[in-house]
Amino acid sequence: MPYFLAKTDPGTYSLSDLERDKTTVWDGVRSPQALQAIKAMHPGDEVLIYHSQGEAAIVGAARVISEPRPDSNDAKSWVVDVQFVRRFDQPVTLREIKESHQFDDWSLVRQGRLSTMSVPDNVVAWLKSKHVL
C-alpha cells in the first residue's frame, strides 16, 4: 500500500480538526510536484499527517477515501477526501528524521516547502520498526 505525507499548519487545520470532522477534502495544494502526489493517491492509501508549525512532526495518519479530482474552487488544483485514522502516541519529529541521516534524499528533508509527497519504502520500514505504523 502506498504511503503519502501531507503537511498542514495546525493553526489552520490540525490533526485534531480532522479527528473531530472525521473526514475532509484535502485541498490547497498548488505546486506541480505536490499535485503529482495528490493525483497518484487512491482510496485506501495511507496519508501521514505532518504539522509544519510549532514542533514540526508527523503526528498521525489518515486514509484516502476518494479518487483525486479537480478542485471545484481552484482550476489549478486537485483534491482528495481523507478520513482520520489515528493519532500517533509519540510524534516523529523532523529533527529525529534529519538526525537519523537515513533519509537525506527524501523530499521532506530536501524540499522543506513541498506540501504533499510520497513516502519512500525505507521510511515506511523505519516507522514500522519504531512501532509508529
How would you describe each model-predicted region?
Residues 14-29:
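Short, basic/aromatic beta-hairpin or loop at an interaction surface
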Residues 48-49, 63:
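Hydrophobic beta-strand signal
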Residues 27-38:
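Short alpha-helix capping/helix-loop boundary micro-motifs
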Residues 1-11, 30, 69-133:
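Contiguous surface segments at macromolecular interaction interfaces
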Residues 50-56:
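Short, charged beta-turn/beta-strand-edge "cap" motif at the junction between a beta-strand
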Residues 57-67:
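Short beta-strand-centered aromatic/proline hotspots
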